[in-house]
A protein has these predicted regions:
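Substrate-binding/active-site clefts of carbohydrate-active enzymes
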Residues: 328-330, 368-544, 551-570, 580-589, ...
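Aromatic-rich carbohydrate-binding modules that target alpha-glucans
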Residues: 58-111, 248, 255-303, 311-339
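Basic K/R-rich, polyanion-interacting modules in nucleoproteins and related proteins
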Residues: 226-264, 323-384
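Solvent-exposed segments in extracellular or luminal domains encompassing
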Residues: 191-207, 930-932
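Conserved alpha/beta catalytic core and glycan-binding cleft of carbohydrate-active enzymes
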Residues: 543, 576-723, 727, 780, ...
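C-terminal beta-strand-rich structural cap/linker in extracellular carbohydrate-active enzymes
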Residues: 853-876, 939
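C-terminal outer-membrane/trafficking sorting elements
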Residues: 7, 881-960
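Residue-level detector of functionally pivotal "anchor" positions at catalytic/ligand-binding pockets or at interdomain
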Residues: 688, 788-790, 794, 871-891
Length: 960
């Protein structure tokens, strides 16, 4: 079945396979040519639509095609996604005779010529849970070649010196037959209908082509013979690792764990993809029967590609004897499915996929240059201070690559976040995805860019004091993974399948109730070894600062797919396994961030959060703390279910701040979307369903989220009031999971209004950005925000108190936050901890204050706004304390023609020594921007700058 190679995110559950139905169909005309219109008709009596939850007769065809050699399988361009079929492929229902039909011309439908066979199945719009028919294939053309022995595209395993009998006939009568082996003509027979030939004394692997020519119509069948190399045992050095070990510029070692397999060949560009017995891998019986081979004579720096040909002479029922697969430890794979659609601007000079091969191949290259890291000793922000910005590279900007992030570094820097968390960037199936359908966990997905480009982004972040966290999906793998395919059930013999009972890495059936893809068995030492290699690869080679572990509920072996209660209960094996992975991460980097998306019971989460937290280098695992519903109730203006105390670690009784509280994430509906759809409208002058009104309430959201001690997270463009629904479709429409139309657009690529409409220049959106930037800076720079807190919430006027009694009275040691999410102004009793002067911490000048003589005197807060008071000015952020000479630097200075500034600014003014304004510039000036002053006379000038927060600074400039 073809669904395993597609651009999708499939939900598989234990009971899902029962939903497949075998249909009855007819094709007219039959046989048919590729340029002839055909009609496929499905008997409605053979389908129980209700089994798939279909009530409106919405069925779809999912189709693919083969070339004339019955290879080079390509999906129909209009398939859509497995979870959301394209309407072009919808079948027409004929109620009169209860049939479904679709008509098309193969050349047009598949956008190709030279079609030898087509395949199709019928499915629901969302095919999740195997809501599909059986796979059906149809030969194209009235002239067909029937190969009796061996079968087309088959592989026959023989011993050296044995023979192979080849028999075939055709549907057109007498024809000319030509048999080639490894490109050399072996036999020719003319003007015959039935062909027979025996190839004797075969001593090398053979790639056969049987060409049949009938009056210029040519069909070529391909098949193979692989020689069993017999006993080939060898002990390898203990320094050789799974995957590639580079010895020198001319030598590489390949190691493959393939338990239960009889022998393995390595086929690649270095042997023209025709390996002889010298490329049979040795088996090391002292290291779990791992296979290994030494490749010598490689050209330094030359790109080579390879696959493993893995053979099991006594394969389990429905499992293939031969699997051709890339290396499971690949760091770069080439894909015939995805690579043709990768823009050269994202991945320049992408190596070409080798002609004539199928499925992924691994790239090998000796003599690679090390990346020239600028920052080699990055000091991570403390866990308590983290402001994490979650990013999906695909939806961040129009080019959908790492360069987009690099180009927008000032956007991150000026927001004053100190960590960026990338949704999965490991090699996933397809190009446009959330990334959780990973197949090669050590390989970078090329759609986003090159390895060096990701390293450049990480290095740039570190230069700007920003940590980089990777989201990893290590609870599962998808169908292209070698760890799936080497031990799989492939009942329809299409090269794809599910893990079988012999699979050492993956469970045959999922052992938890939230499974996607195929479920890893983390109790198996081989799986643990693989996971640890993945961790080591990204930490050592990419200087990744931490991992966010997706769906940690899946790391148990104790449950079943339909037992949600078990999955959500405390599981000791899951706790221990994930502690082991955390320990390994900390062994590589004691300050490594370990983050779990568990969203489960507090017993497990507390055990992880408190784990090793009191060491001299504090550890402790950070947990995602979802608070979307409660915060959205506030932003919409509803006085129910709005207790936000769960955003802080005290609510979970954690020893230390290890809860990453958030109001939005990639997996939840946008707060602004719901504000506009369902917001409170009881006050016409403050209608939350009005865009600008809804935006005006989002600064207060930041005030009651980001300030709470402990790590916090922002979902991308929340700081600009992004209102596009999570269910926004490619075309900008919205189709949710509850809409009448089947399917939803949750996983669709999203539009980019934040840049195309220049939201940073929008006053209402820019205010959110600047307010959150100010809050983030307070959070990360002021010690009090690592102190204690209390939250008074459960109404529309939440109050937050933050304090640190260890700080001096001359320091900022108490913070009081008052917010009003009502649609009317409210007088809020502040309950200040003591009387005296309290300063407005949102005023960068430090000049706004109130004199509190009674701590209970109400303070008026207008609808949707907030107040943040401190007992002292922010000593680190006040404009009055903004060091002129040390903070603002011009280079070169003195200068003759131009200078650059070490800060991102929005305004620059040049004054002469008398105070006269000579020159003024406004704009979004990046750090390092060049300013030309050739028009100025020689002498001394005063340069005054202002950034987006309104902070100003001045310094001297000498013009030569």
């Amino acid at each position: 079945m073809k669904k395993n190679i597609l651009y999708l995110f499939i939900l598989l559950t234990l009971g899902s396979y029962a939903q497949q139905q075998n249909i009855t169909y007819s094709v007219s005309p039959n046989p048919f040519e590729e340029n002839e219109t055909i009609t496929i008709t499905i008997d409605g009596n053979s389908i129980n639509e209700a089994t798939w939850g279909i009530t409106d007769n919405s069925l779809y065809i999912w189709s693919w095609s083969f070339d004339l050699n019955l290879q080079n399988i390509q999906d129909c361009p209009t398939n859509g996604m497995w979870t959301d079929s394209n309407e072009t492929n919808k079948l027409t229902y004929n109620s009169g005779n209860d049939t479904y039909s679709i008509s098309f011309t193969p050349n047009t439908f598949y956008s190709r010529t030279g079609i030898g066979r087509i395949g199709f199945l019928i499915k629901a719009n969302d095919g999740s849970g195997d809501k599909k028919s059986q796979d059906i294939t149809l030969d194209v053309g009235s002239f067909q070649v029937i190969q009796n022995t061996p079968q087309t595209n088959s592989t026959t395993i023989i011993n050296a010196g044995e023979m192979l009998a080849i028999n075939a006939n055709n549907t057109g009568g007498n024809a000319n037959y030509t048999l080639r082996a490894n490109g050399v003509v072996l036999d020719s027979q003319s003007n015959i209908s039935t062909y027979s030939y025996t190839h004797t004394n075969i001593i090398d692997n053979q790639n056969y082509e049987l060409e049949v020519n009938l009056a210029g119509n040519i069909v070529t069948n391909v098949f193979n013979v692989i020689i069993d190399p017999g006993s080939n045992v060898g002990i390898m050095p203990t320094t050789y690792e799974d995957g590639i070990t580079y010895i020198d510029d001319n030598t590489a070692i390949l190691v493959l764990y393939a338990t239960g397999k009889d022998f393995v060949y390595v086929a690649g560009s270095f042997n023209n993809w025709q390996p002889d017995t010298s490329y049979a891998m040795k088996k090391d019986v002292t290291r779990n029967n791992k296979f290994w081979i030494e490749l010598t004579g490689l050209t330094p720096g030359q790109i080579e590609t390879y696959q493993y040909w893995v053979v099991d002479k006594t394969a389990a029922t429905n499992s293939p004897a031969l699997v051709k697969t890339a290396d499971p430890y690949s760091t770069l794979v080439l894909s015939p499915f995805d690579d043709p659609f990768i823009p050269s601007t994202s991945y320049p000079n992408l190596p070409s996929y080798p002609v004539g091969q199928e499925r992924e191949v691994t790239v090998l290259q000796t003599g690679q240059s090390n990346y020239p890291w600028q920052v080699t000793n990055f000091q991570k922000p403390k866990k308590e201070d983290l402001i994490i910005y979650e990013v999906l590279v695909r939806d961040f900007d129009a080019d959908r690559n790492f360069q987009d992030l690099i180009d927008k570094i000032d956007y991150f820097k000026n927001l004053n976040i100190n960590a960026i968390q990338l949704m999965p960037v490991m090699e996933f199936e397809g190009n446009e995805s959330w990334g959780y359908n990973t197949s090669y966990h050590m390989a970078l997905d090329k759609f986003y860019g090159t390895e060096d480009k990701l390293k450049e982004f990480i290095d740039l972040c570190h230069q700007n004091d920003i940590a980089v966290i990777l989201d990893v999906a290590l609870n599962h793998a998808f169908g292209r993974s070698p760890m799936v395919r080497m031990w799989m059930n492939d009942s329809d013999n299409d090269g794809w399948g599910q893990p079988n009972s012999e699979n050492p890495y993956l469970n045959e059936d999922a052992r938890h109730s939230y499974n996607v893809g195929y479920d890893f068995d983390h109790s198996n030492p081989r799986t643990k070894d693989y996971v640890k290699r993945v961790i080591q690869h990204w930490v050592d080679n990419f200087k990744i600062d931490g991992f966010r572990w997706d769906l940690t509920k899946g790391f148990t072996q104790n449950c079943t797919a339909n037992d949600e209660g078990c999955t959500n209960s405390y599981q000791a094996d899951r706790v221990a396994i994930l502690k082991e992975y955390a320990d390994y991460s900390w062994s590589l980097d004691p300050t490594h961030y370990v983050i779990f998306e568990h969203l489960g019971g507090n017993q497990e989460e507390k055990e992880w959060a408190d784990y090793r937290v009191n060491e001299s280098e504090p550890k402790g695992i950070m947990l995602w703390g979802k608070m979307t519903t409660n915060y959205n109730q506030l932003t919409m203006g509803y006085n129910s279910n709005n207790d936000i105390s769960g955003v802080g670690h005290d609510s979970r009784n954690f020893i230390a701040p290890r809860l990453i509280g958030y109001a939005e994430s990639h997996d939840e509906e946008r707060l602004m979307y719901k504000n506009l759809q369902f917001g409170q409208q009881s006050n016409p002058s403050h209608d939350v369903q009005d865009l600008n009104t809804a935006l005006s309430r989002m600064s207060a959201l930041g005030a009651v989220t980001l300030t709470v001690p402990g790590p916090k997270m922002i979902w991308h463009f929340g700081a600009l009031g992004m209102e596009n629904s999570i269910f926004t479709c490619n075309n900008g429409s919205v189709n949710t999971d509850s809409d009448a139309a089947s399917g939803d657009c949750k996983l669709d690529t999203k539009p980019q209004p934040q840049w195309s409409n220049n939201w940073l220049a929008d006053t209402n959106r820019n205010k959110i950005y600047n307010d959150w930037a100010r809050i983030n800076l307070l959070k990360t720079e002021e010690a009090v925000f690592e102190g204690n807190y209390s939250i008074d919430s459960g109404n529309l006027t939440p109050k937050i108190y933050i304090w640190d009694d260890t700080l001096l009275s001359s320091e900022l040691k108490n913070v009081v936050i008052l917010a009003n999410f009502d649609v009317n102004s409210q007088n809020i009793i502040p309950n200040f901890p003591y009387t005296g002067i309290w300063y407005d911490l949102m005023d960068p000048t430090g000049t706004t204050s109130i004199n509190i003589t009674d701590t209970s005197t109400p303070i008026n807060v207008v609808a949707g706004q907030f107040k943040m008071y401190g007992n002292k000015n922010s000593q680190t952020l006040s404009t009055n304390n903004y060091s002129l000479e040390s903070k603002l630097t011009l280079f070169p200075n003195p200068t003759k023609n131009s200078f650059t500034i070490n800060k991102a600014i929005s305004k620059l003014e040049v004054y002469d020594v008398s105070g006269k304004l000579i020159k003024a510039l406004s704009g979004d000036f990046k750090k390092g921007e060049n300013f030309n002053i050739e028009d100025l006379s020689n002498g001394m000038y005063i340069i005054k700058t202002e950034n987006k927060l309104g902070t100003t600074a001045t310094t001297k400039l000498i013009k030569l």
